[in-house]
Amino acid sequence: METKSRLLKRNPEPVRTLSRPQVTVTQPKEEPAKPQPTPDAGVGGSSLDTMVAACAVELMNARNSFHRLHLKITGPGSYAAHVAIGDFYDGLPGHADTLVEGYQGVAEKILTLKDVAPRTLDDLSDGVAYLREMYAMINKLQGMLPYSEIVNNLDLVKDAINSAKYKLLFLK
């Protein structure tokens, strides 16, 4: 009795050599240069610098304008408006500081903050209109900013504006 081998038979064709994939080593990409704002002659900085400074000044002035409005609200729904405006203006100095400090850090320059008189708000409709104007100003600035962290901080200001507007329009 003959024993059959259970071994596999070798293929008679020649063995093919496998080619290894070519590996290419690349140098790490250089970090892109920091975007440079457009020059603005006569201001001592760029137009972006000027707009960020103007936004910060507007936030600081809005604090005073809304504080005064907060103190003169009377009539039906005045308590809800009083509280809503109080919550809003309390946060504005922090938002202004965050904007200026963050921008000065990323741009590595000190902004010039000009003195501008605060706006006078006579009633709630003036306050709501001012909130809408501030929102539009911030939206425009965000569209010009190359720094995502500053854009995100400005989103928080817009969130505070939206919350105040909601409370003033719908909570009585």
Regions found by a protein language model. Give the residues of each.
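Conserved alpha-helical segments that form or flank metal/cofactor-binding pockets of metalloenzymes
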Residues: 79-111
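Acidic/histidine-rich alpha-helical segments that form the ligand environment
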Residues: 115-169
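Intrinsically disordered, compositionally biased, charge-dense segments
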Residues: 1-47, 54
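A structural signal for well-ordered alpha-helices, especially hydrophobic packing surfaces
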Residues: 52, 56, 63-70, 96, ...
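A structural boundary/capping signal
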Residues: 50, 90-91, 118
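Disorder-to-helix initiation segments
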Residues: 41-62, 123-127
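Helix-loop segments that flank and shape redox-cofactor active sites
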Residues: 62-87, 142-147
